[in-house]
Amino acid sequence: MKTLLLTLVMVTIMCLDLGYTLTCYKGYHDTVVCKPHETICYRYLIPATHGNAIPARGCGTSCPGGNHPVCCSTDLCNK
């Protein structure tokens, strides 16, 4: 009986996602799994020459500054 109970507990632990982490885009196609304390995905524009802008993406603890910041808290929301 103890063996059955232990088996059920182990299966439950393996099936549950006890350590949920956020996944954000780091580049245009590249993704990164955020650290547990990073709860925000961000995207903002870095001014470049000739009126162009380079997007910066990643994980953070708060919404950063920058041109046209976009911050969100769901997986892959900073495309």
From Swiss-Prot:
Which InterPro entries does this entry report, sorted A to Z?
A: Snake_3FTx (IPR003571), Snake_toxin-like_sf (IPR045860), Toxin_cobra-type (IPR054131)
Biological classification of the source: Eukaryota, Metazoa, Chordata, Craniata, Vertebrata
Q: Where is the protein situated, by its record's location annotation?
A: Secreted
- Tell me the leader sequence span: 1-21
Q: Does the keyword Signal apply?
A: yes
Q: Name one GO molecular function term.
A: toxin activity
Q: What does this protein do?
A: Binds with high affinity to muscle nicotinic acetylcholine receptor (nAChR) and hinders acetylcholine binding to the receptor, thereby impairing neuromuscular transmission. Competes with the binding of alpha-bungarotoxin on muscle AChR (from Torpedo) with an IC(50) of 0.30 uM. Causes muscle paralysis, spasms and increased respiration.
Q: Which GO terms describe its cellular component?
A: extracellular region
Q: Which family does it belong to?
A: Belongs to the three-finger toxin family. Short-chain subfamily. Type III alpha-neurotoxin sub-subfamily.
Major site of localization recorded for this protein: secreted
Tissue specificity, in the record's words, reads: Expressed by the venom gland.
Organism name? Pseudonaja textilis (Eastern brown snake)
Identify the keywords attached in UniProt to this record, alphabetized. Answer: Acetylcholine receptor inhibiting toxin, Disulfide bond, Ion channel impairing toxin, Neurotoxin, Postsynaptic neurotoxin, Secreted, Signal, Toxin
Protein name in UniProt: Short neurotoxin 2
Q: Which cysteines are joined by disulfide bonds?
A: 24-41, 34-59, 63-71, 72-77
